[in-house]
Regions:
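Aromatic "clamp/platform" in nucleotide-sugar-dependent glycosyltransferases that forms part
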Residues: 247
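Conserved acidic donor-binding segment of nucleotide-sugar-dependent glycosyltransferases
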Residues: 226, 278-279, 283-290, 299-304
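Carbohydrate-associated surface elements
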Residues: 131, 149
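Nucleotide-activated donor-binding/catalytic signature segment of Leloir-type glycosyltransferases, i.e.
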Residues: 213-230
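Short hydrophobic beta-strand element within catalytic cores of glycosyltransferases
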Residues: 264-267
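Conserved donor-binding/catalytic core segment of Leloir-type glycosyltransferases
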Residues: 170-186, 192-196
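Short alpha-helical donor nucleotide-sugar binding micro-motif in glycosyltransferases
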Residues: 226-227, 234-239
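A short helix/loop element that forms part of the nucleotide-sugar donor recognition site in Leloir-type
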Residues: 156-169, 307
Length: 339
């Protein structure tokens, strides 16, 4: 199968961590024996003209490579670029929704109109969670719930002691970790407040953002800043509990990665995490209940460390398995077009 993959998030020289989850899926599709050509934006920022360039690149690739199917990641703008490419090549379009694309369409009439045009053109849609699929509302093509999964080799169990020695963090009581941008929607200040109420252990934030100053200088709190994606597993290995108590997470990739490394999690009950965080793997917390977060930290810290049950739950989302499921959707779209 010849696949043209179109995405607005892809690792590049400036931003090697951008869209790693899409890169991993493309890699596994190739391992399955499929040809995958990529038209992508590989850097953050820049002018909106980059989206027009993405569309032009996708159309040119479709004419040059003659794919069997176009696989776009994000409903818009990549979905729009993918739709144009699919029309030129006269092949089916499959589009995957990741979260921000759906929420953006719900907030903007212009984006909602553009997104409806993409979904009307698509032969099939893929959503990374059932919660997100429900947010799509009524759409014409079938929606398949398949997340991008986790690389079980990269996020494999490691001894905590070695990671703590390497990082110089995590030896004093339960070690809590948050990975992601320091934004209000991530509830990082609420997490720091809940940790202070708990009164023991250590808390590290891997990531940066506008709330950094509100977290700086707190007892027991370490601000590691942004680190390359390749270094994230060491931080997860050093922790006892990965915390992702956001207002909502359309999927919750960081929690899944921690579970794959046999670490328990505290995750938001809003969005995708309830679909893969089992009671044995972690604690779900209502983001509207501030007092519940301290209790959740204590409950998660009481789970086994390391936690084999967390790894077992994460293994259901092996990126190899998920890529094979996506390939089946693409193949069905091709077969339906030829019937």
């Amino acid at each position: 199968m010849r696949i043209l993959l179109v995405t607005q998030m892809w690792p590049g020289p400036r931003d090697p961590d951008l869209g790693v989850f899409v890169f991993d899926v493309a890699r596994e599709l190739r391992r399955l024996g499929h040809e995958v050509d990529v038209s992508a934006i590989d850097r953050r920022g820049g002018s909106p003209a980059k989206y027009a360039r993405l569309g032009a690149a996708a159309v040119a690739a479709a004419r040059r490579r003659r794919p069997d199917v176009v696989f776009a990641h994000f409903l818009f703008p990549a979905g729009g670029a993918g739709a144009a490419a699919a029309a030129v090549a006269r092949v089916p379009l499959v589009v995957m929704a990741h979260g921000t694309d759906v929420e953006n369409a719900r907030r903007s009439r212009v984006l909602a109109t553009a997104t409806r045009a993409v979904t009307a053109r698509a032969a099939a849609l893929i959503s990374n969670s059932r919660w997100l699929a429900d947010r799509l509302g009524p759409v014409r093509p079938p929606v398949h719930v398949i997340d991008c999964g986790v690389d079980l080799d990269v996020f494999a169990p490691r001894p905590a002691a070695a990671a703590r020695s390497q990082l110089g963090w995590g030896d004093d009581g339960p070690a809590f970790l948050a990975v992601g941008s320091l934004l209000e929607r991530k509830r990082v200040v609420e997490l720091a407040d809940a940790f202070a109420q708990l009164g023991r252990g250590s808390l590290a934030f891997v990531g940066d953002g506008p709330l950094r100053e509100r977290l700086a200088g707190r007892p027991g709190v370490t601000l590691a800043g942004r680190v390359p994606h390749a270094e994230v597993p060491a931080w997860i290995a050093a922790c006892d509990v990965l915390c992702q108590p956001s207002r909502l997470e359309p999927f919750g990739q960081a929690a899944l990665e921690a579970m794959a490394m046999q670490r328990s999690v505290v995750a938001t009950a809003q969005g995708g995490p309830p679909e893969f965080v089992t009671p044995q793997a972690g604690v779900l917390v209502d983001p509207s209940d501030g007092a519940a977060l301290t209790t959740a930290l204590a409950q998660a810290a009481a789970l086994p460390a390391p936690n084999p049950a967390a790894r077992a739950a994460a293994a259901e989302h092996d990126v190899r398995r998920q890529a094979a499921r996506m390939a089946a959707v693409l193949e069905e779209a091709i077969a339906a077009r030829r019937r």
